[in-house]
Design a protein with these regions (language model features):
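Extended, structured, electrostatic nucleic-acid-contact surfaces
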Residues: 1-13, 25, 29-32, 36-41, ...
């Protein structure tokens, strides 16, 4: 999550251009992710999506 490009984020199931942009914006505004669960702090990323992608992401 801390080094992924927009294109890399978009390879995750359920993550399109808008969500990838939101992840990058969150990272730029708040600094590095401390854990993967922090992803759910982003608007539009709920527990269901997190559970679908959590095995494919790391900080």
């Amino acid at each position: 999550l801390n080094t992924a490009t927009k294109e890399e984020l978009m390879t995750l199931s359920g993550v399109g251009e808008s969500r990838a942009d939101s992840i990058i914006a969150y990272r730029e505004e708040n600094g590095r992710f401390q854990n993967t669960e922090e992803l759910m702090q982003i608007s539009g990323i709920k527990e269901g999506l997190y559970n679908k992608i959590k095995d494919n992401i790391t900080v």
